[in-house]
Amino acid sequence: VSTLLKITPMAEPYACLTWQVNNFCNFQCSYCNPGNWAGDNRNNGNLQLYIDNTMKIFNTYKQRGYKHFKIFFSGGEPTHWENFIPLVTYLKEHIPNITVAVNTNLSRPLKYWQEHYHLFDDIVASFHVEFCKKDRYIENAKFLCDKVDYLCTKMLMHDERFWEVVEFGERVRQEVPNYNLEWTPLFDEMSVNAGPWKYKDPVKQSFLENAQFESVQRIDKPYRENYAVSMAHYDTGVEPVNSNKIIAARQNFFTGWKCQVDDALFINPRGDISGASCGVGQTHGNITDTDLTFDLKPVICNKQHCHCGTDIIIPKEPVNV
């Protein structure tokens, strides 16, 4: 197994804002913490304040010389947030080079994506076997796969229905012309302090350890130059970061590493802003503050286990390098 040495920006430093817009989801998966779907923080209204403060965040990075920007929306299910489309539309109009990404369960009807696909560069389509309407997922994936720069078909590996998920992944292979297929192991409770799920069946564990990220393109799709990307430096070479690969190899342990958490601000469902989602970075107020200000600085990680894909890809390296 290759040894991870460090994670760096592909070119220049880039700023990424990950926004868990609310905690309402139309799915209530058994492996997901209720904090992700309870629905008590809908965060509707305040659109202009959200726009103003989001622009203030990115303008702060611009003033520091940053040229590359990404915003990644999650939830809950962000497509059910009433501010979602108006906010994304504004950002696309006012930050022309921004990469807009969304993590969605792809449950919206096809018409939704026909109307709004042009707003998105990256779509991470999580498959949740307990609630997903499989035919709708396939229909939407087939439509989107040649409309956006990157479509990830992300299979959440439910323990009891593991092989049903594998079977659906095979259906994606057969029916979706362009796909980026990820087999994603679960985390216990899927919360800030979550540990990796223990798959007791060694066959399942072996499947995950040997599963490869699969990228297939059979038909033409848009290509967009994107510099808001991190690179993983291994003792065997350099490649784009794949957080699943790092997790499967049990190399997502960065205690003592210098991590650029404030290049990757996180907004939780209550609106609190912090460096990354792990709880190690400092807090910077709330997205609804009328006088939002913040300072940006890295941290030396004191947490044993880095569990979130958006945190794993943040540029970081051991302090003795």
Please identify what each model-predicted range represents:
Residues N23, G76-T79:
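Catalytic nucleophile-elbow at a beta strand-turn-alpha helix junction centered on a G-D-S/GDSL motif
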Residues A15-V21, F72-F73:
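Short, hydrophobic/glycine-enriched beta-strand segments
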